[in-house]
Design a protein with these regions (language model features):
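Surface loops and adjacent helix of pleckstrin homology
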Residues: 40, 49-52
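Negatively charged, low-complexity tracts enriched in Asp/Glu with abundant Ser/Thr
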Residues: 1-28, 51-74, 87, 91-92
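Amphipathic, interaction-prone secondary-structure segments
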Residues: 20-45
């Protein structure tokens, strides 16, 4: 679990270190809302939002990713204090 205040920092740190096609998943404590980040290429990411709204953000660079995560943090996790955090590795 990660603190909501560390959400963006942990997400950005993790996506830089995962392999291409791996995903990072963040869920609320109740696990009813989630944000999933997929690394599609070096420096390019897809973000899917599944919770209050369902939306997909495609081909984001690191700067756009940070901006999108700030937006999603306010929208999907407004009252959350802790988030479940999981790295989903693709099989080779």
């Amino acid at each position: 679990m990660v603190s909501i205040t560390d959400f963006i920092d942990v997400a950005l740190y993790t996506v830089k270190r995962i392999e291409i096609n791996d995903k990072v998943n963040f869920k609320t404590f109740k696990k009813d809302r989630e944000v999933e980040i997929e690394k599609i290429d070096k420096g390019l990411f897809n973000v899917s939002e599944n919770g209050f709204h369902r939306e997909v953000f495609l081909n984001l660079d690191e700067k756009e990713l940070k901006r999108t995560l700030k937006y999603l943090q306010k929208k999907e996790f407004p009252k959350s204090n802790k988030l479940w955090y999981k790295i989903i590795r693709t099989k080779k």
